[in-house]
Amino acid sequence: PPSAILSGLVGSEMCIRDSLGTFLATLVCIPISFVASRQIFKFGLIRFLIKRFLDFIRGVDILIWAIIYVRAFGLGPFAGLLSIFTVDVGTLGKLFSEATDNADARQIEGMQSTGASKVSVIRYGLIPQIFPIFISQSLYFFESNTRSAVILGVVGAGGIGLQLTERMKAQYWDQTLFIIILILIMVAIIDTASRIIRKNIIDE
């Protein structure tokens, strides 16, 4: 039926939005984590300001960000993407910087003692240690964002949550049930795939 096709398309849009938001946040957080880490960046004031900025972003709930972006850019998936991106930057930035801080300093110091450049130290001494952690955490947040997608849709940030809300208001209970089942299936598939990928990365 048309409603099934529409829900499927909206579900696909939700997956694309969530994955894009998480992917962009990951790209932004990698350089942020280096600047916020005492292993790489020695200017304490800059590190302090960046960490407080990340604390502020992380301290505002994703629902509040969604309302702000819906007001600024109107209804639709773009507001949802920005909400996911903003919250993920705050949280992943903190997690990435902590992972960088906890990297084995002996390997980094060993390369520095040989006169290696800062870029070489990061490329060969640091990234091999932290890259699996970054990927694992990013996948987990993509999985978590899929669950948040329904809430984002309720406030008008697009996605399958908006379709669910509209059908509940219209009392189309058969279509409501179909969308709920679709959400459960999508979450189960993404959870399973993410868990398998993260397990393989950690095992390696």
Each model region followed by its residue ranges:
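Single conserved hydrophobic/aromatic residue that forms the stacking wall/gate
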Residues: 1-10, 15-16
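Hydrophobic positions within alpha-helical transmembrane segments of bacterial inner-membrane proteins
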Residues: 22, 26-30, 34, 63, ...
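Cytoplasmic-entry segments and transmembrane alpha-helices of multi-pass inner-membrane transporters
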Residues: 32-66, 95-98
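Short amphipathic alpha-helical coupling elements at transmembrane boundaries
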Residues: 48-58, 98-113, 124, 166-170, ...
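Generic hydrophobic transmembrane alpha-helix motif, especially the helices
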Residues: 54-85
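Glycine-rich helix-loop "coupling/hinge" segments at transmembrane-helix boundaries
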Residues: 71, 148-183, 202-204
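Membrane-cytosol interface at the C-terminal ends of specific transmembrane alpha-helices
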Residues: 75-126, 132-141, 192
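C-terminal transmembrane helix and the adjacent membrane-cytosol boundary/short C-terminal tail
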Residues: 136, 177-204
